[in-house]
Regions:
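Basic, Lys/Arg-rich alpha-helical nucleic-acid-recognition elements, primarily the DNA-binding modules
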Residues: 1-77
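Short, well-ordered helical secondary-structure segments
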Residues: 6, 25, 31-33, 88, ...
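Residues at structural and domain junctions
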Residues: 10, 20-21, 38, 87, ...
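Alpha-helix boundary/interfacial micro-motifs
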Residues: 30, 49-51, 56-59, 74-78, ...
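Short, surface-exposed, charged/polar-biased interaction segments
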Residues: 31, 45-46, 56-59, 70-73, ...
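Alpha-helix boundary/capping detector
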Residues: 40, 50-51, 61-65, 78-79, ...
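Short, charged recognition helix plus adjacent turn
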Residues: 66-97
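Hydrophobic protein-protein interaction segments
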Residues: 93-284
Length: 285
């Protein structure tokens, strides 16, 4: 495993712990600058890895990239996804009602306003927004191939409740959130019809997927992320436990499921027409 990968996982697990960088550095007996250097891929001793693992409450092997990584906070999970996406050449996903990497600035704006109404921890909000901004920018620069399957039932709820479905917000903001949701689904229909190179969508018309998952294929390996966290949820939410792994048995099993669902899903003109039908039925007027 490369030192940069150990550093990436160290940062993700630090965010998962909820501890500040200076707090971890103090307990470890190093400077905060030294901790940041570890996160950037500087050489780290095995005894330091052991002590970090104890502090972060993970196994040393997991910190070294061997085994399954578990995350109970959206912040740490999406940071880990960001790291893997930056090296991925292909992304296959059973996703939220949208594919975040190609959403509009309006999506980010309405979500930021909804989160600000609910979450008092400004630093948490800033960290969350920085991660998502970095994910979008990385996609813009690298343009990995992306195949996304969307559940029809989740799209219906998205149109009825709007961006930030699980976030408590004022009636006025909820109305705006529904308008943005309708705009995003309309954009996906347009993207399906435009058929841009390297970007494909399909619609799971008769399937309510039980698991959102992402397969990210890089030059050296494929990573699987199983995700209970929607990209439009509050960073303070605690709704489940996600996992990230490169274990071949997990990756291959999910790849087989994704291939079957892709073959059975609604694509092209039929998918675009179905999305516009859902807009007519469920979007705010």
């Amino acid at each position: 495993m490369r030192l940069s990968e150990i550093g990436q996982q160290l940062r993700a697990f630090r965010l998962e712990s909820g501890m500040r960088a200076d707090e971890i550095a103090a307990r470890l007996g190093v400077s905060r600058a030294a901790l940041y250097r570890y996160e950037k891929g500087e050489v780290i001793k095995l005894d330091t890895v052991q002590r970090l693992a104890e502090l972060l409450k993970v196994s040393p092997l997991t910190l070294l990239g061997i085994g399954v990584e578990y995350y109970s906070r959206p912040l740490s999970f999406f940071e880990r996804v960001r790291q893997v996406e930056e090296e991925a050449d292909q992304i296959l996903q059973i996703s939220d009602p949208v594919a975040y990497l190609v959403t509009s600035p309006e999506y980010d704006s309405i979500l930021a306003r909804a989160i600000a109404e609910q979450v008092e921890n400004k630093q948490l909000i800033e960290q969350y927004q920085e991660i998502f901004t970095a994910r979008r920018e990385s996609y813009r620069l690298r343009r990995p191939t992306m195949i996304t399957m969307l559940s029809e039932q989740s799209i219906e709820r998205f149109l009825q409740r709007g961006v930030g479905e699980a976030i408590t917000m004022s009636d006025e903001l909820r109305t705006e959130a529904r308008k943005v949701a309708a705009m995003e689904i309309g954009r996906i229909a347009e993207l399906i019809e435009a058929e841009p190179i390297g970007l494909q969508f399909s619609l799971l018309a008769d399937v309510e997927s039980t698991t959102n998952c992402i397969l990210m294929r890089g030059r050296e390996r494929m990573m699987l992320a199983i995700n209970p966290f929607r990209c439009d949820m509050s960073p303070a939410a605690t709704t489940g436990v996600s996992l990230v792994t490169s274990a071949p048995e997990a990756v291959n099993a999910h790849q087989r499921v994704i291939e079957v669902l892709w073959a059975e899903s609604c694509k092209g003109k039929e998918a675009a027409e179905r999305l516009r039908s859902l807009l007519a039925q469920h979007a705010i007027q």
